[in-house]
Amino acid sequence: MAASFDYRQPVGRGSYVGLGVNLMRDAAGISNFNRQTGAISASVMRQLGGGRYSSTDQFLVAGAQVGIGQQGFEWNQLWFSSQYDVANAAVNFDNPNGEAFINNMSDLYVDFNAGIMWYALFDERQSFYIGGALHHLNSPNITFLDQTNELPTRWVAHLGGELPIGDELSLLPAAAVMGQNQSLSTTGGVNFRYTNREWREIALRAGAWAHVVNQLESGFSLDAITATAILEMEEWNLGFSYDITTSTLTNANNGRGAFEVSLIYTHPAKSRRARVNCPNF
């Protein structure tokens, strides 16, 4: 479960500052492994081109984020090899697990992130963006034990855009690549966006996305496929997605994927002059 809020304020001709808040909680598995984070962010946005004498709007955005986090799990819901009773061929939870768990939660840690993005809008339904970010710049310690377990810095690169096909249909391709130590993850796909002038501010999106990861022993493999559907309204976006597991993880989740719902509200600008053109994601 996640929630976020952001606010933009003009600070001169073609320049803006932004503030944001992000909250997230995630839990999974029989051990209820959970993670909760909260962060505040600040950004600077500068118009590089466009306006009265150019049909192409270009913007450069840079931002930084600082937050706190904590992780936890219920280790008493797990069993370890030292608890397996060979004589009875069963697990005996009364036996010590041999692990040095101090508590169910890690200490609170501070986390720093930063990123940058450039985008251009060539027409009402034609745009391109590219950006990158670094997460966990300070490599916070997330251990459950009385020792050091640093979270490595993760880098992200992403790009995408919108390409019109006729008067009512357009393509929204995008891709994101993430790396952390030896791990590499890539997500890419496309949404089809349909709108009709009679619908005014309403549009429909549907698409598919593939998630590819590197297996250290067997190379790259397809981990999951995601189907998406989004209803765009004047101020609201309502989205649905379903992840279909395609890797060997199906042995653990019985082939069941994850269903997600998203709801986005965009407060309308006070005037047309205060509106900032942004690409469709």
Task: Indicate residue ranges for each PLM-predicted region.
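Subset of outer-membrane beta-barrel
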Residues: 1-281
